[in-house]
Amino acid sequence: AQVVRGITENDGVVLIVGTRPDLRPSIRSAVERLGANGFHVSTERWLPGVLTNASKLLASATQYSVQSQRTQGDLKDESVPNMTQLSTLGYRPDLVIVLNPTENEHAIREATQCHVPTMAIIDTNVDPRSVTYAIPANDDSPRVAELVMGVLSKAGEDGLRRRRAALEAWDKHQRRLQKRRQEPAPLPSDTPS
């Protein structure tokens, strides 16, 4: 939990991978808690290249959304972003959490290839050395996944709260410094002491 807290406190992105339908409710609630710092992959299977070939996958998805908005009349030509710029954007999470690692070995391998730390619920049928942070528990149980995701997402939520508090303290400090700079300097007194 401290890993997730530290990542969200430093404005990191957490990717949650769970490809079984019974895991979707716990994944959705965890992503809602993490807000903009949490994303999920809960399709039927892991799509190869989500991490290693993200620029190509994201470029086509972005182009599709821009094209669909243009056909619906929601998007004007002058507001269309540069497509070459969108295709160079990459997606790289700071942590990948895998809820069912036996079905998502490719996701773990791809994250390892991209040097992204992985965290997974590890049962006796999975090698714990395949992930960076192993959580020893039953990876087949949706209740265990719900419990683990609840703990991890609340830790991430706490990290976001800490980040907000630190940013507010920094902003308050900066405003205080700015106010001191704007105050006129005291005039030296004419009488000797």
Each PLM stretch: what is its role?
Residues 158-193:
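Internal, active-site/partner-interface "lid" segment
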Residues 1-168:
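Ribosome large-subunit tunnel/peptidyl-transferase-proximal elements
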